[in-house]
């Protein structure tokens, strides 16, 4: 080999070594940056800062689509930031590899979308995994009972004729209620009592304008239902409704039918499906007591907040409010035709029943 060829060969080897060195360095740097990115994302995730953690997990999933942990973290971030439909794909990848938290979030996701049978399966799997690790299962057993209750309720979905809906700002929902005088009137608590502080509660006043029902916060910081009567042009005789109605949770948004004894209200306790649910009770004049409240069925109640049931008998119209499928700060006011004789939706079509229970559309 002549000197020239030797130098060329040596130069090529040096070049290859340099390339290998650079590639190795870049791979090492990439690995370090990935580790730093993962650590930072996990820190944000554990702090509940899902929106901030989401971009990092998205990149990690793109690089390693089969990684079960990345899929679970990214799926949870999507769920917690409102992208529930998109989250399902990633949570299912994690669940296939038995990632514990994936089952919990799939249970929640299926519950939110009225797939209660599947939600029951996911929560049962989650409970079984917790039990194997000797972790507390009680909160999730209670959640499972809530899912089973929702499934039973969907099976008994009422055939309700909903004729219109209106999306409004949450604080302005009462503007959608158009009651005739004989049905009484509704006001915000802060407006009726002329308070500067806004309050998420309402006041119902009867047609005679001599009796009110309203919700007010107690020293324990939950809403309870009260009533007052007008005495000599002044409101007085304040009474809290009995504990058959009020509870350790929140009771709010009362409305009294023109018979003066039937009361609709919303509660966050008593086995609700999620948030506020609608209930009805009746005052027994002979015993001076209220009957055990009855939870309304679907489509009136949902996994979201449902409240302010009002029926104007003279108009033969009813209203109720729900934040189901609505962005933060918005609610939907549904207008329906009341039916004194409750009728079940008679169909074996599960998708139709799910659609009518959730009010996916109004036809």
Residue ranges of model-derived segments:
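Alpha-helical segment of the N-proximal tetratricopeptide repeat
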Residues: 36-66, 73
């Amino acid at each position: 080999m002549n000197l020239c060829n030797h130098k060329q060969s040596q130069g090529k080897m040096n070049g290859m070594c340099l390339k290998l060195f650079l590639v190795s360095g870049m791979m090492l740097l990439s690995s370090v940056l990935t580790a730093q990115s993962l650590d930072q994302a996990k820190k944000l995730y554990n702090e509940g800062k899902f929106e901030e953690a989401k971009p990092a997990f998205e990149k990690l999933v793109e690089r390693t689509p089969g990684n079960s942990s990345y899929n679970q973290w990214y799926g949870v971030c999507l769920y917690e930031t409102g992208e529930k439909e998109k989250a399902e794909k990633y949570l299912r990848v994690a669940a296939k590899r038995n990632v514990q938290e994936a089952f919990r979030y799939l249970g929640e996701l299926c519950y939110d979308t009225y797939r209660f049978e599947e939600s029951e399966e996911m929560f049962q799997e989650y409970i079984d995994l917790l039990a194997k690790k000797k972790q507390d299962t009680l909160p999730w057993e209670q959640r499972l009972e809530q899912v089973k209750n929702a499934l039973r309720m969907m099976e008994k979905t009422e055939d309700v004729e909903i004729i219109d809906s209106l999306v409004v700002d949450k604080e302005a929902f009462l503007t959608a209620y158009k009651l005739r005088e004989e049905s009484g009137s509704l006001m915000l608590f802060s407006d009726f009592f002329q308070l500067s502080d806004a309050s998420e509660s309402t006041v119902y006043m009867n047609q005679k304008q001599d009796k009110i029902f309203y919700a007010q916060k107690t020293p324990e910081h939950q809403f309870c239902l009260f009533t007052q009567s007008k005495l000599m042009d002044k409101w007085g005789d304040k009474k809290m409704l009995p504990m058959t109605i009020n509870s350790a949770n929140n009771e709010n948004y009362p409305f009294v039918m023109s018979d003066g004894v039937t009361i609709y209200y919303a509660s966050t306790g008593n086995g609700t499906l999620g948030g506020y649910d609608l209930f009805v009770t009746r005052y027994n004049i002979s015993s001076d007591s209220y009957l055990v409240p009855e939870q309304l069925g679907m489509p009136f109640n949902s996994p979201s907040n449902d409240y302010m049931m009002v029926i104007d008998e003279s108009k033969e119209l009813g209203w109720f409010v729900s934040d189901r499928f609505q962005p933060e700060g918005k609610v939907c006011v549904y207008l329906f035709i009341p039916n004194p004789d409750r009728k079940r939706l008679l169909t074996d079509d599960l998708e139709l029943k799910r659609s009518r229970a959730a009010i996916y559309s109004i036809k």
